[in-house]
Regions:
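Conserved alpha/beta enzyme-core scaffold
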Residues: 1-147
């Protein structure tokens, strides 16, 4: 893929993402923290109004920090330690729903996803990847996303 370069997998974000896009990020132990850190470090000043949709996340959740509120708008479908403060302080949104309802939100475009940032295994000899440790709604998000 020409948009991912070098051994450090530097991503040319302008080919994937633009201001105003809605991204879905993987959940629980499969949060793509390295991708999100790279996006924040390289593009936080160049992008704005990126809606980040996710269910429960583990880790630092830099995108949910107040200093990035002009770049990222968090839309948490479940609340956890890393997102509760942002919602309480009203610089993030909480959309309560049942886990079983989320795939339909993506498929019927009630909540259209532009880009899905997810963790997958390396491809096997046949080119198939596993969604790994946290599949839940990730499959629906990946299939529904523009990219």
């Amino acid at each position: 893929m020409d948009h991912i370069k070098g051994s450090q997998n530097q991503i040319d974000w302008k080919h994937f993402l633009k201001s105003g896009d809605r991204i879905f990020i993987g959940s629980n132990a499969a949060v793509p923290n390295a991708l999100m850190d790279q996006l924040i470090d390289e593009q936080a000043s160049a992008l704005n109004d990126i809606e980040v949709v996710h269910i429960l996340t583990l880790g630092e959740n830099r995108w949910a920090q107040k200093q990035y509120q002009d770049t990222f708008t968090l839309n948490a479908l479940f609340l956890g330690q890393g997102t509760r403060e942002a919602v309480h302080e009203e610089y993030a949104d909480y959309t309560p729903c049942f886990l079983s309802e989320i795939p339909s939100l993506f498929h019927d475009r009630t909540l259209p996803i532009d880009v899905a940032l997810i963790s997958v295994s390396p491809p096997d000899p046949h080119g198939y990847c596993s969604l790994g440790v946290s599949v839940n709604v990730v499959h629906a998000a990946a299939r529904s996303a523009r990219m």
